[in-house]
Amino acid sequence: MELSELIEVTRVRDAFMRKGPRPAQVGDICIFGHHLIFAPTTVGKEVPDNAEEFWLLHKAVDRVLCEPISKENPQRGGLLALKCKNFLLIIFEIGDLEICRATARTIESLSNINGFLHDYAFFYNSPFTILDDGWSAFDLEQEFARLMLSTDAFRISSVNENFAICPTYPEKLIVPKGIGDDYLKISATFREGGRFPVLSYFHKETKSPLVRCSQPLIGPTNRRCREDETILNSMITVNRGYIIDTRSKSSATAAKAKGGGAEPQGNYRQWRYIQCPIPRQREIHDALTRMVDVCSERKVTSDRWVSRVGQAGWLSSVAASLEAAANVAQCIYNERLEEVPVVIHGGDGLDSTLIASSLAQILLDADARTIRGFESVIEREWICGGHPFSLRNNHCAYAEGTVTGPFESPVFLVFLDAVHQMIAQYPMSFEFDENFLIFLFEHAYASEFGSFLGNCEKEKKDNGIRKKTVSLWSHVHHPENMKQFVNVCYDPTPGVIWPSIAPQCIKIWDRLFFRWQRPDNSWSTPETETIQSLADHWKLREKELIAKASSLRRSVVELSRELRVLSPM
């Protein structure tokens, strides 16, 4: 199929475009295979002050609406509304109603093509020189080499070569060293989707591994798999481990009736079972829809608006994700215990499991709070970890796909919002700022890069994505691009961070939900030099206070000595 076959209208002249509260512009709409381009009309050689050429990927459009300006007088033309996946609302006023409808049909068709083989990423030519190829930036062998500096308890297994055991896992995985591939194959038959236990993270300080997998298929008959038990028990050295289930008790019970379930205590005696529920896919999807609706509401009282924000359920989903991650981190980072293995799973291990495992790493590891370290977490846990981006992100808050509707959910956005909450509470502990998170959100839904294409590594390999497209990380790693994401106040915080999950501490992400409702300059931030100056001032002030505290401690010690000398025996 050629994309040109779907284009009924290639150009619409003299259309009015409105983007949120920004002033309307007059110009031409040009439609190509992958983009809609709005070119403002010039008057003679003069360009209006508010003129802005606007490019929009069709893939970024979530919903298309078309209606006449006046039902009583169709000759006045039509209104074309494009609701985008990044919550931008664009309205075009077109003088001819039939042309407006044809334009709507064209954009509707181009934005809802099944699959991803016609996506722009396959046709994009990078305008910059790739200095650091993102496709090879996070190699498993390199990760394993770093791991070997801390422990020799794991090995690389090629048991999933050609994706023979698990289609959603990569071909190479890090597994416990004393376990043979035959045990892994048997364990795969006992875990949902073949997702047997694999290493996700190793905490150097406490020597505690974080392992993820999917639910065990015990079913109503309490099926048992001794090989799976052996894999988990092989990680027990000194202390009992933890199995953390990201489902609610009712969900785990319902799953057992359908063939799934949770690890029975009688078979996994060296493990403590903990439930840290994160909302399910559908709940997250509906919560975002309600949240976006609330944030676009204008005619409502403050009390009613606050109530609706709470009822939307989005902030509670983010808080639940942070709470689950904090529980994982607490199990791993225990000052009294070392070598405490933690296994985490939900149902299929593709959504809430990845939220908890990746957030826990950011809490525990300062390296994960750098740009490159954060990318590594996303690459390992989400992209290689098998999160089905193409299914989950086919639509966002405004629409549902005819085929993919039941599978769509902004799970990755929950993760990004949770990281945003961490940045809000620890603004100097992250090398990147919220601009980077919004950038990742937008590219996860529509992008000229191939990183988020497909649902797993198998689909990437089958469709040649790594060979035919440019990695998003290649773009980020270019010095000219990276500087826009750097937090100038960054001051590395070693060790663990513990963000509060109290309701009053979980904030609405203004830059995400409200940025299109304000004029362009309302989100302007102080100049970099000003921010840097403030950061330097407070760093200097911190050093002064630390020095003063040390001096006071020395004075206390000296006074204590004098007191002992002067005090009678």
Swiss-Prot record:
It is found in: Cytoplasm; Membrane. InterPro entries: Myotubularin, Myotubularin-like_Pase_dom, PH-like_dom_sf, Prot-tyrosine_phosphatase-like. Residues 134-513 form the Myotubularin phosphatase domain. Pfam families: Myotub-related, PH-GRAM_MTMR6-like. It is a peripheral membrane protein. One of its GO terms (molecular function) is protein phosphatase binding. It comes from the Eukaryota. SUPFAM superfamilies: (Phosphotyrosine protein) phosphatases II. Keywords: Cytoplasm, Endocytosis, Membrane. PANTHER family: LD06050P, MYOTUBULARIN-RELATED. May act as a regulatory subunit for mtm-6. In association with phosphatase mtm-6, plays a role in endosome trafficking probably by regulating phosphatidylinositol-3-phosphate levels. Regulates fluid phase endocytosis in coelomocytes. Regulates posterior migration of QL neuroblast descendants and the anterior migration of QR neuroblast descendants and HSN neurons during larval development probably by controlling Wnt ligand secretion through the regulation of sorting receptor mig-14 trafficking. Involved in the formation of correct synapse number in DA9 motor neurons. Heterodimer with lipid phosphatase mtm-6. This is Myotubularin-related protein 9. The lineage of its organism: Eukaryota, Metazoa, Ecdysozoa, Nematoda, Chromadorea. The gene is mtm-9.
